[in-house]
Amino acid sequence: MSEDPKNIKRALISVYDKTGLEDLARALDNAGVEIVSTGSTAKKIADLGIDVTPVEKLTGFPECLEGRVKTLHPRVHAGILADTRKEDHLKQLEELEVEPFQLVVVNLYPFRETVASGADFDGCVEQIDIGGPSMVRAAAKNHPSVAVVVDPARYGDVADAVANGGFTLEERRGLARDAFLHTADYDAAVSAWFVDQLSDGDVTTPLRYGENSHQSATVTRIGTTGLANAKQFNGKEMSYNNYQDADAAWRAAWDHERPCVAIIKHANPCGIAVSEESIAAAHRAAHACDPMSAFGGVIAVNREVTVEMAEQVKEIFTEVIVAPSYEEGAIEVLKAKKNLRVLQAEHEAPKEEVKYISGGMLTQEPDTYQAEGDNPANWTLAAGEALNESDLAQLEFAWRSVRAVKSNAILLAKDNATVGVGMGQVNRVDSAKLAVERANTLADGANRAEGSFAASDAFFPFADGLEVLLEAGVKAVVQPGGSIRDEEVIEAAKKAGVTMYFTGTRHFFH
Protein backbone atom coordinates (compact mmCIF):
# COMPACT_ATOMS: atom_id res chain seq x y z
CA MET A 1 0.00 0.00 0.00
CA SER A 2 1.48 3.35 -0.98
CA GLU A 3 0.26 6.94 -1.01
CA ASP A 4 1.84 10.35 -0.72
CA PRO A 5 1.68 11.61 2.88
CA LYS A 6 -1.26 13.87 3.79
CA ASN A 7 0.04 17.24 4.96
CA ILE A 8 -1.08 18.23 8.46
CA LYS A 9 -2.39 21.79 8.56
CA ARG A 10 -4.82 21.61 11.46
CA ALA A 11 -4.79 19.54 14.65
CA LEU A 12 -7.29 18.93 17.45
CA ILE A 13 -5.72 18.08 20.81
CA SER A 14 -7.64 17.00 23.93
CA VAL A 15 -5.63 14.99 26.45
CA TYR A 16 -6.06 14.11 30.11
CA ASP A 17 -2.50 12.80 30.40
CA LYS A 18 -0.27 15.77 29.57
CA THR A 19 2.87 13.63 29.22
CA GLY A 20 4.85 14.84 26.19
CA LEU A 21 2.33 17.58 25.42
CA GLU A 22 4.91 20.38 25.42
CA ASP A 23 7.15 18.67 22.85
CA LEU A 24 4.14 17.78 20.72
CA ALA A 25 2.73 21.30 20.76
CA ARG A 26 6.11 22.86 19.93
CA ALA A 27 6.63 20.43 17.02
CA LEU A 28 3.22 21.31 15.60
CA ASP A 29 3.76 25.02 16.13
CA ASN A 30 7.18 24.92 14.47
CA ALA A 31 5.59 23.24 11.45
CA GLY A 32 2.94 25.94 11.22
CA VAL A 33 0.07 23.63 12.24
CA GLU A 34 -3.05 25.36 13.57
CA ILE A 35 -3.92 23.90 16.98
CA VAL A 36 -7.46 23.65 18.37
CA SER A 37 -7.75 22.39 21.93
CA THR A 38 -9.99 21.96 24.96
CA GLY A 39 -10.06 22.99 28.59
CA SER A 40 -6.89 22.36 30.57
CA THR A 41 -5.10 21.12 27.45
CA ALA A 42 -5.64 24.47 25.72
CA LYS A 43 -4.50 26.33 28.84
CA LYS A 44 -1.30 24.27 29.07
CA ILE A 45 -0.49 24.96 25.41
CA ALA A 46 -1.26 28.67 25.77
CA ASP A 47 0.97 28.85 28.86
CA LEU A 48 3.83 27.67 26.62
CA GLY A 49 3.37 30.79 24.51
CA ILE A 50 1.96 28.80 21.60
CA ASP A 51 -1.07 30.02 19.65
CA VAL A 52 -4.08 27.79 20.32
CA THR A 53 -7.77 28.12 19.45
CA PRO A 54 -10.06 27.11 22.34
CA VAL A 55 -12.74 24.73 21.10
CA GLU A 56 -15.52 26.98 22.43
CA LYS A 57 -14.33 29.72 20.08
CA LEU A 58 -14.56 27.24 17.21
CA THR A 59 -18.06 26.07 18.13
CA GLY A 60 -19.48 29.33 19.46
CA PHE A 61 -20.81 27.25 22.34
CA PRO A 62 -19.34 27.31 25.85
CA GLU A 63 -17.99 24.29 27.71
CA CYS A 64 -20.81 23.27 30.07
CA LEU A 65 -22.14 20.76 32.60
CA GLU A 66 -18.90 20.70 34.57
CA GLY A 67 -16.93 19.85 31.45
CA ARG A 68 -19.19 17.01 30.31
CA VAL A 69 -19.85 18.80 27.02
CA LYS A 70 -16.85 20.28 25.23
CA THR A 71 -16.36 18.73 21.80
CA LEU A 72 -19.75 17.14 21.12
CA HIS A 73 -20.61 19.67 18.44
CA PRO A 74 -21.13 19.49 14.64
CA ARG A 75 -18.35 22.03 13.99
CA VAL A 76 -15.90 19.67 15.69
CA HIS A 77 -17.14 16.38 14.30
CA ALA A 78 -17.75 17.70 10.79
CA GLY A 79 -14.12 18.76 10.74
CA ILE A 80 -13.05 15.27 11.84
CA LEU A 81 -15.41 13.18 9.71
CA ALA A 82 -15.24 15.04 6.40
CA ASP A 83 -13.79 12.73 3.76
CA THR A 84 -11.64 15.21 1.85
CA ARG A 85 -11.41 12.83 -1.10
CA LYS A 86 -15.04 13.69 -1.88
CA GLU A 87 -15.92 16.94 -3.61
CA ASP A 88 -19.38 17.09 -2.04
CA HIS A 89 -17.86 16.84 1.46
CA LEU A 90 -15.48 19.69 0.68
CA LYS A 91 -18.35 21.75 -0.73
CA GLN A 92 -20.44 21.20 2.40
CA LEU A 93 -17.53 22.21 4.63
CA GLU A 94 -17.19 25.43 2.64
CA GLU A 95 -20.91 26.16 2.96
CA LEU A 96 -20.80 25.47 6.70
CA GLU A 97 -17.59 27.45 7.11
CA VAL A 98 -15.91 24.44 8.76
CA GLU A 99 -12.22 23.68 8.36
CA PRO A 100 -11.15 19.99 8.29
CA PHE A 101 -8.68 18.46 10.73
CA GLN A 102 -5.80 16.29 9.52
CA LEU A 103 -4.69 15.24 13.02
CA VAL A 104 -6.60 14.32 16.20
CA VAL A 105 -4.64 13.69 19.41
CA VAL A 106 -6.71 12.39 22.31
CA ASN A 107 -6.23 10.36 25.44
CA LEU A 108 -9.06 9.45 27.76
CA TYR A 109 -10.15 10.04 31.33
CA PRO A 110 -8.32 7.64 33.69
CA PHE A 111 -11.24 5.30 34.37
CA ARG A 112 -9.21 2.24 35.39
CA GLU A 113 -6.99 4.31 37.68
CA THR A 114 -10.06 5.86 39.32
CA VAL A 115 -11.54 2.42 40.00
CA ALA A 116 -8.22 1.18 41.38
CA SER A 117 -8.05 4.19 43.73
CA GLY A 118 -11.17 2.97 45.53
CA ALA A 119 -13.39 5.83 44.38
CA ASP A 120 -17.11 5.51 45.04
CA PHE A 121 -19.67 4.64 42.35
CA ASP A 122 -20.44 8.22 41.33
CA GLY A 123 -16.75 9.10 41.29
CA CYS A 124 -16.03 6.25 38.89
CA VAL A 125 -18.97 7.14 36.65
CA GLU A 126 -17.69 10.71 36.42
CA GLN A 127 -14.46 9.37 34.91
CA ILE A 128 -16.23 7.62 32.02
CA ASP A 129 -15.10 9.59 28.99
CA ILE A 130 -17.72 10.40 26.36
CA GLY A 131 -16.35 13.12 24.12
CA GLY A 132 -12.88 11.58 23.92
CA PRO A 133 -13.92 8.17 22.54
CA SER A 134 -16.32 9.93 20.15
CA MET A 135 -13.47 11.96 18.64
CA VAL A 136 -11.14 8.96 18.55
CA ARG A 137 -13.68 6.73 16.79
CA ALA A 138 -14.63 9.49 14.34
CA ALA A 139 -11.01 10.14 13.42
CA ALA A 140 -10.23 6.42 13.15
CA LYS A 141 -13.21 5.88 10.87
CA ASN A 142 -12.08 8.76 8.67
CA HIS A 143 -8.43 7.63 8.54
CA PRO A 144 -8.20 8.30 4.77
CA SER A 145 -8.30 11.99 5.73
CA VAL A 146 -7.25 12.11 9.40
CA ALA A 147 -4.44 10.69 11.53
CA VAL A 148 -5.47 9.79 15.09
CA VAL A 149 -3.00 9.38 17.97
CA VAL A 150 -4.01 8.01 21.40
CA ASP A 151 -0.63 7.16 22.91
CA PRO A 152 1.90 9.78 24.10
CA ALA A 153 4.63 7.33 23.05
CA ARG A 154 3.68 8.13 19.43
CA TYR A 155 4.18 11.90 19.74
CA GLY A 156 7.69 11.54 18.32
CA ASP A 157 6.14 9.95 15.23
CA VAL A 158 3.83 12.96 14.96
CA ALA A 159 6.80 15.34 15.11
CA ASP A 160 8.53 13.38 12.35
CA ALA A 161 5.37 13.31 10.25
CA VAL A 162 4.65 17.05 10.40
CA ALA A 163 8.27 17.74 9.49
CA ASN A 164 8.11 15.40 6.50
CA GLY A 165 4.75 16.07 4.91
CA GLY A 166 2.42 14.02 7.12
CA PHE A 167 1.41 10.38 7.63
CA THR A 168 0.91 7.99 4.71
CA LEU A 169 -2.37 6.11 4.29
CA GLU A 170 -0.72 2.92 5.54
CA GLU A 171 0.47 4.74 8.66
CA ARG A 172 -2.97 6.28 9.22
CA ARG A 173 -4.57 2.86 8.96
CA GLY A 174 -2.19 1.55 11.59
CA LEU A 175 -3.03 4.49 13.85
CA ALA A 176 -6.76 3.84 13.30
CA ARG A 177 -6.30 0.19 14.28
CA ASP A 178 -4.55 1.25 17.49
CA ALA A 179 -7.30 3.78 18.19
CA PHE A 180 -10.11 1.24 17.86
CA LEU A 181 -8.20 -1.20 20.08
CA HIS A 182 -7.81 1.61 22.62
CA THR A 183 -11.52 2.50 22.72
CA ALA A 184 -12.53 -1.17 22.76
CA ASP A 185 -10.28 -1.80 25.75
CA TYR A 186 -11.65 1.31 27.47
CA ASP A 187 -15.27 0.25 26.90
CA ALA A 188 -14.46 -3.27 28.09
CA ALA A 189 -13.10 -1.85 31.35
CA VAL A 190 -16.23 0.24 31.86
CA SER A 191 -18.63 -2.61 31.06
CA ALA A 192 -16.74 -5.08 33.27
CA TRP A 193 -16.85 -2.58 36.13
CA PHE A 194 -20.61 -2.13 35.74
CA VAL A 195 -21.14 -5.90 35.72
CA ASP A 196 -19.03 -6.14 38.87
CA GLN A 197 -20.95 -3.35 40.59
CA LEU A 198 -24.37 -4.77 39.77
CA SER A 199 -23.70 -8.47 40.36
CA ASP A 200 -24.64 -10.27 43.57
CA GLY A 201 -21.06 -11.39 44.13
CA ASP A 202 -17.58 -11.16 42.71
CA VAL A 203 -17.42 -11.28 38.93
CA THR A 204 -14.22 -13.32 39.07
CA THR A 205 -13.94 -16.04 41.68
CA PRO A 206 -10.87 -18.19 42.33
CA LEU A 207 -11.29 -21.96 42.01
CA ARG A 208 -9.37 -24.49 44.10
CA TYR A 209 -7.22 -25.30 41.09
CA GLY A 210 -7.43 -25.77 37.35
CA GLU A 211 -7.62 -28.89 35.24
CA ASN A 212 -4.81 -30.30 37.39
CA SER A 213 -3.84 -29.49 40.97
CA HIS A 214 -0.72 -27.52 39.97
CA GLN A 215 -2.74 -25.10 37.81
CA SER A 216 -4.43 -22.00 39.22
CA ALA A 217 -7.89 -21.12 37.89
CA THR A 218 -10.81 -18.72 38.21
CA VAL A 219 -14.37 -18.48 36.93
CA THR A 220 -15.62 -15.15 35.58
CA ARG A 221 -19.33 -14.42 35.55
CA ILE A 222 -20.70 -12.25 32.75
CA GLY A 223 -24.29 -11.10 33.01
CA THR A 224 -26.81 -12.89 35.20
CA THR A 225 -27.79 -16.05 33.30
CA GLY A 226 -26.11 -19.21 32.10
CA LEU A 227 -24.11 -21.86 33.87
CA ALA A 228 -21.50 -19.51 35.39
CA ASN A 229 -24.32 -17.75 37.27
CA ALA A 230 -26.04 -20.93 38.46
CA LYS A 231 -27.51 -21.06 41.95
CA GLN A 232 -25.97 -23.90 43.98
CA PHE A 233 -28.15 -25.67 46.54
CA ASN A 234 -25.87 -28.45 47.71
CA GLY A 235 -22.43 -30.00 47.53
CA LYS A 236 -18.83 -28.89 47.47
CA GLU A 237 -17.61 -25.85 45.55
CA MET A 238 -17.57 -26.24 41.78
CA SER A 239 -14.17 -27.09 40.33
CA TYR A 240 -12.69 -26.13 36.97
CA ASN A 241 -13.40 -29.62 35.61
CA ASN A 242 -16.94 -29.55 37.06
CA TYR A 243 -17.63 -26.38 35.08
CA GLN A 244 -16.11 -27.86 31.92
CA ASP A 245 -18.22 -31.02 32.07
CA ALA A 246 -21.35 -29.19 33.22
CA ASP A 247 -21.05 -26.83 30.28
CA ALA A 248 -20.70 -29.74 27.85
CA ALA A 249 -23.71 -31.47 29.40
CA TRP A 250 -25.76 -28.26 29.46
CA ARG A 251 -25.05 -27.68 25.79
CA ALA A 252 -25.91 -31.28 24.89
CA ALA A 253 -29.23 -31.22 26.77
CA TRP A 254 -30.34 -27.92 25.24
CA ASP A 255 -29.55 -29.15 21.72
CA HIS A 256 -32.88 -30.98 22.02
CA GLU A 257 -36.35 -29.46 22.02
CA ARG A 258 -37.91 -32.51 23.66
CA PRO A 259 -37.36 -33.27 27.39
CA CYS A 260 -33.72 -34.36 27.52
CA VAL A 261 -31.11 -35.67 29.94
CA ALA A 262 -27.42 -35.63 29.03
CA ILE A 263 -24.72 -37.36 31.09
CA ILE A 264 -21.15 -36.23 30.45
CA LYS A 265 -17.71 -37.42 31.52
CA HIS A 266 -14.52 -35.63 30.43
CA ALA A 267 -16.59 -33.44 28.08
CA ASN A 268 -17.97 -36.43 26.13
CA PRO A 269 -21.42 -38.01 26.41
CA CYS A 270 -21.89 -41.20 28.38
CA GLY A 271 -25.52 -41.05 27.36
CA ILE A 272 -28.19 -38.72 25.97
CA ALA A 273 -31.91 -39.46 25.86
CA VAL A 274 -35.23 -37.74 25.29
CA SER A 275 -38.64 -38.85 26.51
CA GLU A 276 -42.16 -37.48 26.29
CA GLU A 277 -43.17 -39.92 29.05
CA SER A 278 -41.19 -38.26 31.85
CA ILE A 279 -37.84 -36.69 32.58
CA ALA A 280 -37.15 -39.64 34.88
CA ALA A 281 -37.59 -41.99 31.92
CA ALA A 282 -35.13 -39.91 29.91
CA HIS A 283 -32.63 -40.18 32.77
CA ARG A 284 -33.01 -43.95 32.95
CA ALA A 285 -32.42 -44.27 29.21
CA ALA A 286 -29.41 -41.94 29.21
CA HIS A 287 -27.84 -43.82 32.12
CA ALA A 288 -28.46 -47.17 30.45
CA CYS A 289 -26.31 -46.20 27.46
CA ASP A 290 -23.08 -46.55 29.46
CA PRO A 291 -23.67 -47.14 33.20
CA MET A 292 -19.98 -47.69 33.94
CA SER A 293 -18.87 -44.35 32.48
CA ALA A 294 -21.83 -42.50 34.00
CA PHE A 295 -20.39 -43.25 37.46
CA GLY A 296 -19.03 -39.91 38.67
CA GLY A 297 -20.51 -38.10 35.70
CA VAL A 298 -22.26 -34.76 35.28
CA ILE A 299 -25.97 -34.57 34.47
CA ALA A 300 -27.76 -31.75 32.66
CA VAL A 301 -31.51 -31.54 32.14
CA ASN A 302 -33.49 -29.17 29.92
CA ARG A 303 -36.69 -29.54 31.97
CA GLU A 304 -37.66 -29.48 35.63
CA VAL A 305 -36.13 -32.29 37.70
CA THR A 306 -38.91 -34.30 39.32
CA VAL A 307 -38.80 -36.08 42.66
CA GLU A 308 -38.87 -39.36 40.72
CA MET A 309 -35.73 -38.45 38.80
CA ALA A 310 -34.06 -37.13 41.96
CA GLU A 311 -34.63 -40.49 43.65
CA GLN A 312 -32.87 -42.20 40.72
CA VAL A 313 -29.93 -39.79 40.74
CA LYS A 314 -29.52 -40.26 44.49
CA GLU A 315 -28.67 -43.92 43.92
CA ILE A 316 -25.84 -43.16 41.46
CA PHE A 317 -22.55 -41.43 42.26
CA THR A 318 -22.83 -38.12 40.40
CA GLU A 319 -20.60 -35.05 40.61
CA VAL A 320 -23.02 -32.38 39.36
CA ILE A 321 -26.62 -32.02 38.28
CA VAL A 322 -27.83 -28.83 36.60
CA ALA A 323 -31.38 -28.00 35.55
CA PRO A 324 -33.58 -24.95 34.96
CA SER A 325 -35.81 -25.86 37.93
CA TYR A 326 -36.63 -28.56 40.48
CA GLU A 327 -39.98 -29.96 41.53
CA GLU A 328 -40.86 -29.29 45.16
CA GLY A 329 -39.09 -31.91 47.25
CA ALA A 330 -36.55 -32.87 44.58
CA ILE A 331 -33.71 -30.80 46.03
CA GLU A 332 -34.33 -32.28 49.48
CA VAL A 333 -33.98 -35.75 47.97
CA LEU A 334 -30.71 -34.82 46.26
CA LYS A 335 -29.32 -33.27 49.45
CA ALA A 336 -29.09 -36.79 50.85
CA LYS A 337 -25.87 -36.96 48.80
CA LYS A 338 -23.89 -34.28 50.63
CA ASN A 339 -21.16 -33.98 47.98
CA LEU A 340 -23.52 -33.79 44.98
CA ARG A 341 -23.42 -30.30 43.49
CA VAL A 342 -27.01 -29.31 42.74
CA LEU A 343 -27.27 -26.33 40.38
CA GLN A 344 -30.14 -24.33 38.99
CA ALA A 345 -29.40 -22.19 35.94
CA GLU A 346 -31.32 -20.13 33.46
CA HIS A 347 -30.45 -21.26 29.95
CA GLU A 348 -28.61 -18.77 27.80
CA ALA A 349 -27.45 -19.62 24.30
CA PRO A 350 -23.78 -18.64 23.86
CA LYS A 351 -23.24 -15.60 21.67
CA GLU A 352 -19.62 -16.27 20.79
CA GLU A 353 -16.96 -18.91 21.34
CA VAL A 354 -13.45 -17.76 22.19
CA LYS A 355 -10.28 -19.85 22.27
CA TYR A 356 -6.86 -18.50 23.12
CA ILE A 357 -3.92 -19.65 21.02
CA SER A 358 -0.25 -18.77 21.11
CA GLY A 359 0.02 -15.12 20.18
CA GLY A 360 -3.69 -14.43 19.89
CA MET A 361 -7.16 -15.87 20.01
CA LEU A 362 -9.85 -17.39 17.82
CA THR A 363 -13.50 -16.41 17.90
CA GLN A 364 -16.43 -18.02 16.15
CA GLU A 365 -20.19 -18.06 16.05
CA PRO A 366 -21.42 -20.97 18.22
CA ASP A 367 -22.38 -24.16 16.38
CA THR A 368 -26.08 -24.46 17.12
CA TYR A 369 -28.82 -26.30 15.27
CA GLN A 370 -29.68 -23.47 12.94
CA ALA A 371 -28.18 -24.51 9.62
CA GLU A 372 -30.48 -25.48 6.76
CA GLY A 373 -29.07 -29.00 6.80
CA ASP A 374 -30.16 -29.60 10.39
CA ASN A 375 -33.80 -29.81 9.32
CA PRO A 376 -34.67 -33.35 8.12
CA ALA A 377 -37.04 -31.80 5.60
CA ASN A 378 -33.95 -30.54 3.78
CA TRP A 379 -31.97 -33.77 3.89
CA THR A 380 -31.11 -35.56 0.67
CA LEU A 381 -31.93 -39.26 0.42
CA ALA A 382 -28.65 -40.70 -0.87
CA ALA A 383 -29.37 -44.44 -0.57
CA GLY A 384 -32.18 -46.84 0.31
CA GLU A 385 -35.84 -46.12 0.97
CA ALA A 386 -37.13 -43.00 2.69
CA LEU A 387 -37.78 -43.56 6.39
CA ASN A 388 -41.23 -43.36 7.89
CA GLU A 389 -41.96 -40.51 10.31
CA SER A 390 -41.10 -42.51 13.42
CA ASP A 391 -37.75 -43.77 12.14
CA LEU A 392 -36.84 -40.36 10.73
CA ALA A 393 -37.38 -38.91 14.21
CA GLN A 394 -34.92 -41.48 15.59
CA LEU A 395 -32.35 -40.51 12.97
CA GLU A 396 -32.88 -36.82 13.74
CA PHE A 397 -32.29 -37.55 17.44
CA ALA A 398 -28.98 -39.21 16.53
CA TRP A 399 -28.02 -36.19 14.40
CA ARG A 400 -28.85 -33.73 17.19
CA SER A 401 -26.89 -35.80 19.68
CA VAL A 402 -23.72 -36.36 17.66
CA ARG A 403 -22.87 -32.65 17.84
CA ALA A 404 -22.08 -33.09 21.54
CA VAL A 405 -19.42 -35.70 20.75
CA LYS A 406 -15.76 -34.80 20.18
CA SER A 407 -14.65 -35.36 16.59
CA ASN A 408 -14.24 -37.74 14.90
CA ALA A 409 -17.71 -38.69 16.13
CA ILE A 410 -20.00 -41.61 15.39
CA LEU A 411 -23.16 -42.06 17.45
CA LEU A 412 -25.68 -44.90 17.50
CA ALA A 413 -29.20 -44.33 18.81
CA LYS A 414 -32.28 -46.42 19.43
CA ASP A 415 -35.60 -45.64 21.12
CA ASN A 416 -34.71 -41.96 21.59
CA ALA A 417 -31.49 -42.72 23.43
CA THR A 418 -27.85 -43.15 22.57
CA VAL A 419 -26.66 -46.74 22.70
CA GLY A 420 -23.09 -46.40 21.43
CA VAL A 421 -20.76 -43.42 21.20
CA GLY A 422 -17.45 -43.39 19.35
CA MET A 423 -15.64 -40.19 20.20
CA GLY A 424 -12.37 -38.38 19.69
CA GLN A 425 -10.66 -40.83 17.35
CA VAL A 426 -8.24 -39.61 14.71
CA ASN A 427 -9.92 -41.62 11.97
CA ARG A 428 -13.59 -42.32 11.35
CA VAL A 429 -13.13 -46.09 11.10
CA ASP A 430 -11.94 -46.30 14.71
CA SER A 431 -14.81 -44.05 15.84
CA ALA A 432 -17.28 -46.38 14.12
CA LYS A 433 -15.66 -49.45 15.68
CA LEU A 434 -15.74 -47.83 19.12
CA ALA A 435 -19.41 -46.88 18.79
CA VAL A 436 -20.34 -50.44 17.80
CA GLU A 437 -18.19 -51.99 20.51
CA ARG A 438 -19.71 -49.80 23.21
CA ALA A 439 -23.22 -50.45 21.94
CA ASN A 440 -22.71 -54.20 22.10
CA THR A 441 -20.71 -54.62 25.31
CA LEU A 442 -21.90 -52.03 27.83
CA ALA A 443 -25.42 -53.22 28.59
CA ASP A 444 -26.02 -56.84 29.54
CA GLY A 445 -24.28 -58.10 26.42
CA ALA A 446 -27.14 -56.90 24.23
CA ASN A 447 -26.49 -56.40 20.51
CA ARG A 448 -27.78 -52.83 20.57
CA ALA A 449 -26.02 -51.75 17.37
CA GLU A 450 -28.32 -53.93 15.27
CA GLY A 451 -31.29 -51.89 14.11
CA SER A 452 -29.86 -48.66 15.50
CA PHE A 453 -29.72 -45.27 13.81
CA ALA A 454 -26.23 -43.91 13.12
CA ALA A 455 -24.99 -40.33 12.82
CA SER A 456 -21.56 -39.12 11.73
CA ASP A 457 -20.50 -35.53 12.48
CA ALA A 458 -18.62 -35.29 9.16
CA PHE A 459 -18.54 -37.19 5.88
CA PHE A 460 -17.05 -40.64 5.43
CA PRO A 461 -13.85 -40.09 3.39
CA PHE A 462 -13.92 -43.77 2.37
CA ALA A 463 -16.53 -46.50 2.53
CA ASP A 464 -14.62 -48.39 5.25
CA GLY A 465 -16.05 -46.40 8.18
CA LEU A 466 -19.58 -46.87 6.93
CA GLU A 467 -18.94 -50.57 6.31
CA VAL A 468 -18.20 -51.05 10.02
CA LEU A 469 -21.69 -49.73 10.77
CA LEU A 470 -23.29 -51.76 8.00
CA GLU A 471 -21.72 -54.97 9.29
CA ALA A 472 -23.10 -54.14 12.75
CA GLY A 473 -26.61 -54.00 11.31
CA VAL A 474 -27.55 -50.33 11.58
CA LYS A 475 -30.91 -49.45 10.07
CA ALA A 476 -30.12 -45.98 8.74
CA VAL A 477 -27.28 -43.48 8.60
CA VAL A 478 -27.17 -39.68 8.50
CA GLN A 479 -24.02 -37.79 7.54
CA PRO A 480 -23.11 -34.48 5.87
CA GLY A 481 -21.86 -35.93 2.58
CA GLY A 482 -19.42 -34.02 0.45
CA SER A 483 -16.56 -36.50 0.12
CA ILE A 484 -14.93 -36.95 -3.27
CA ARG A 485 -15.73 -40.64 -2.70
CA ASP A 486 -19.42 -40.12 -1.91
CA GLU A 487 -20.41 -42.46 -4.75
CA GLU A 488 -18.31 -45.24 -3.24
CA VAL A 489 -19.97 -44.68 0.15
CA ILE A 490 -23.45 -44.50 -1.40
CA GLU A 491 -22.84 -47.73 -3.29
CA ALA A 492 -21.87 -49.51 -0.05
CA ALA A 493 -25.11 -48.38 1.61
CA LYS A 494 -27.19 -49.42 -1.40
CA LYS A 495 -25.52 -52.83 -1.50
CA ALA A 496 -26.39 -53.38 2.16
CA GLY A 497 -29.95 -52.12 1.67
CA VAL A 498 -29.44 -49.40 4.28
CA THR A 499 -31.03 -45.96 4.12
CA MET A 500 -28.60 -43.05 4.13
CA TYR A 501 -29.31 -39.32 4.20
CA PHE A 502 -26.99 -36.39 3.46
CA THR A 503 -27.48 -33.21 5.48
CA GLY A 504 -25.04 -30.90 3.73
CA THR A 505 -24.08 -29.57 7.17
CA ARG A 506 -21.07 -30.62 9.24
CA HIS A 507 -20.74 -30.50 13.04
CA PHE A 508 -17.06 -30.85 13.91
CA PHE A 509 -16.38 -30.41 17.64
CA HIS A 510 -12.81 -30.04 18.91
UniProtKB/Swiss-Prot annotation:
**Which SUPFAM superfamilies does the UniProt record give?**
Cytidine deaminase-like, Methylglyoxal synthase-like
A GO cellular component annotation here is: cytosol
Sorted alphabetically, the Gene Ontology BP terms of this entry are: 'de novo' IMP biosynthetic process
Domain MGS-like residues, every copy: 2-150
Q: State the reactions this protein catalyses.
A: (6R)-10-formyltetrahydrofolate + 5-amino-1-(5-phospho-beta-D-ribosyl)imidazole-4-carboxamide = 5-formamido-1-(5-phospho-D-ribosyl)imidazole-4-carboxamide + (6S)-5,6,7,8-tetrahydrofolate; IMP + H2O = 5-formamido-1-(5-phospho-D-ribosyl)imidazole-4-carboxamide
GO MF, one example: IMP cyclohydrolase activity
Pathway in which the depicted protein is active: Purine metabolism; IMP biosynthesis via de novo pathway; 5-formamido-1-(5-phospho-D-ribosyl)imidazole-4-carboxamide from 5-amino-1-(5-phospho-D-ribosyl)imidazole-4-carboxamide (10-formyl THF route): step 1/1; Purine metabolism; IMP biosynthesis via de novo pathway; IMP from 5-formamido-1-(5-phospho-D-ribosyl)imidazole-4-carboxamide: step 1/1
What does its UniProt record remark on the domains? The IMP cyclohydrolase activity resides in the N-terminal region.
Name this polypeptide is given = Bifunctional purine biosynthesis protein PurH
* Origin species: Corynebacterium aurimucosum (strain ATCC 700975 / DSM 44827 / CIP 107346 / CN-1) (Corynebacterium nigricans)
What gene name is given for the protein in this entry?
Answer: purH
